[in-house]
Design a protein with these regions (language model features):
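Positively charged n-region of N-terminal signal peptides that target proteins for export
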Residues: 1-5
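Hydrophobic h-region of N-terminal signal peptides that target proteins for export
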Residues: 6-18
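Glycine-rich, charge-decorated loop segments at or immediately adjacent to ligand/cofactor-binding or catalytic sites
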Residues: 88, 179-180, 268-272
């Protein structure tokens, strides 16, 4: 009897001793896996070929729900000041996603015609609408990721963000999903029965290619695996292909995390000094370092970079 109790005691001690090792191994694995959160820009009220607004919007939300991923919608509410727009905002809010600021009318801050005072008004006007939502998130994303073409505008608006309690809703993984979506809609408008598998494959290939590129830069710049935020738009491509895209990231070993968790990463405290300012945060940090001139292009991402390949593929 005493021997049995002793053996049981040893077994318990052995199992207890193994638990920290297992947790440590899990922690080490997590620290070496790339992580990504999904963020969406704009907000559309359009019906799309084959899908009503309610249908394709719900497809995005359903796929986020399927993968247990909480996103941020950076909304510019100027075009959303109607019943359909209110539906979009409330549907995302009720699904537990954050609603953040993307200006009211989506102006380009790097345009000399867009003054600092005009841009401040854009933030405030948008803020007055989105602040009423329970999941309001005090982050601001620059339209087109353009943060100003002069030092005065860049520093002036950064000071304004801080004054108003906002943080910069940086993208770390930039891409041109909007361009693929525009061609997808064009094809389905021409032929609602068109085979879109080629668009799906190209979308996944493009988004993942940009993720690998920016993750590699981030590794070199920080010496670790950061929490990424990837740029998508509220569009038909996301509705049709998001499930496959997330599955692809998972298959490649990426961990999907919530957007508000991603924004807690210390990398988002970095303030690049390059002017013109903007693009992906990782692009800006690489540009600032002066070590990656052969790897960087300007603009960092653009539909023009995809046109020839999509043309050749008949997309």
């Amino acid at each position: 009897m005493a021997k049995s109790i002793y053996l049981l005691f040893l077994l318990i001690i052995q199992n207890l001793g193994g638990m920290p090792d297992n947790k440590l191994a899990e922690k080490e694995l997590s620290s070496t896996r790339p992580k990504v959160a999904f963020t969406f820009d704009d907000g559309s009220t359009r019906d799309m070929p084959n899908y009503s607004l309610e249908e394709w919007n719900e497809m995005i939300l359903s796929n986020l729900r399927k993968h247990d991923a909480k996103a941020v919608l950076f909304a510019n509410v100027g075009p959303l000041q109607n019943e359909k727009g209110k539906y979009v905002l409330s549907s995302w809010d009720k699904a537990g996603h954050k609603i953040a600021n993307h200006t009211y009318t989506h102006p380009r801050f790097s345009d000399p015609k867009t003054t600092l005072e005009m841009f401040k008004t854009e933030l405030l006007r948008n803020d007055s609408v989105i602040r009423s939502y329970p999941n309001f998130y005090q982050y601001f994303r620059f339209p087109y990721l353009k943060e100003g073409e002069t030092k005065e505008k860049v520093e002036g608006f950064r000071a304004f963000l801080k004054e108003k309690g906002y943080k910069n809703g940086h993208v770390t993984i930039d891409a041109s999903d909007w361009y693929i979506a525009s061609r997808l809609v064009e094809r389905l408008t021409e032929n609602p029965q068109a085979d879109v598998s080629g668009f799906r494959d190209f979308y996944i290939e493009h988004m993942y290619d940009r993720a690998v590129f920016y993750d590699g830069l981030a590794d070199e710049l920080t010496g670790r695996k950061i929490h990424h935020t990837i740029l998508l738009h509220h569009n038909l491509a996301a509705a049709m292909f998001l499930d496959d895209l997330i599955a692809h990231f998972k298959e490649k070993g990426w961990e999907i995390i919530d957007a508000d968790e991603a924004f807690k990463d210390p990398v988002f405290n970095e303030v690049p000094t390059v002017v013109p300012a903007g693009e992906s945060l990782i692009w800006a940090l690489a540009k600032q370092s002066g070590k990656y001139e052969k790897d960087l292009r300007y603009p960092a991402e653009n539909g023009d970079y995809l046109k020839a390949k999509m043309d050749s593929l008949g997309l």
